[in-house]
């Protein structure tokens, strides 16, 4: 996957759930060049449950959760690892 991200002109999308998959698909249809959607075969839980008019995947990255206390780490994830990162964030706050 990393080598594909280095290819000039190739847009690589790695959505975390069905909502992001739909958003990435819409972005891929708008792109002039080639696009790749790296999908998981896992049954992933939705990571975004609130309706938003903006295509957040178009930003490239966005925040899913704010820290409830002073931040000591920043968790970054894509694709199926987003669910894992959200679980880690929850455990770190307890």
Q: Where in the sequence are the language-model features?
A:
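Conserved thiamine diphosphate
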Residues: 1-30
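Thiamine diphosphate
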Residues: 1, 29-94
């Amino acid at each position: 996957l990393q080598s594909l991200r280095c290819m000039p002109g190739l847009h690589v999308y790695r959505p975390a759930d069905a909502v992001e998959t739909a958003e990435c698909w819409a972005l891929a249809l708008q792109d002039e060049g080639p696009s790749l959607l790296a999908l998981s075969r896992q049954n992933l839980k939705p990571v975004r449950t609130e309706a938003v008019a903006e295509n957040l995947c178009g930003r490239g990255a966005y925040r899913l959760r704010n820290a409830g206390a002073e931040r000591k780490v920043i968790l970054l994830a894509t694709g199926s690892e987003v669910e894992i990162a959200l679980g880690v964030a929850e455990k770190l706050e307890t």
